[in-house]
């Protein structure tokens, strides 16, 4: 079982959504990224080059959220997961994109999608929701 690195609660303004008002006004998205990676070398060597740089993770994730508008947060989550999986040291990733200001007329606390990718079956392959 691999170690885990987590980036939780990254808040970035974006213009994603199907409705014109979402794209015109924008809204805050909250993103959680969990990646499974062997951190033994990083721990032993105390060297940033031996781990996944979480500053880069936050910056690239924020750039995707703030970047070109997408209709679906499923697409946004997939783009984040795919760039994380570009690093061959990563065994798997889970990306949660929260859209707490979604245009839903009923009162709600959150709406989110969870995108998971794993090396099982090849780069960027989807894995079942039951676990990594």
From Swiss-Prot:
Its EC number is 4.1.2.25, 5.1.99.8, 1.13.11.81. The active site is at residue 99. Substrate binds at residues 22, 54, 73-74. One of its GO terms (molecular function) is isomerase activity. GO terms for cellular component: cytoplasm. GO terms for biological process: folic acid biosynthetic process; tetrahydrofolate biosynthetic process. Keywords: Folate biosynthesis, Isomerase, Lyase, Oxidoreductase. It holds the Pfam family FolB. Gene3D superfamilies: 3.30.1130.10. Pathway: Cofactor biosynthesis; tetrahydrofolate biosynthesis; 2-amino-4-hydroxy-6-hydroxymethyl-7,8-dihydropteridine diphosphate from 7,8-dihydroneopterin triphosphate: step 3/4. It comes from the Bacteria. Belongs to the DHNA family. NCBIfam families: folB, folB_dom. This is Dihydroneopterin aldolase. It comes from Mycobacterium leprae (strain TN). The lineage of its organism: Bacteria, Bacillati, Actinomycetota, Actinomycetes, Mycobacteriales. The gene is folB.
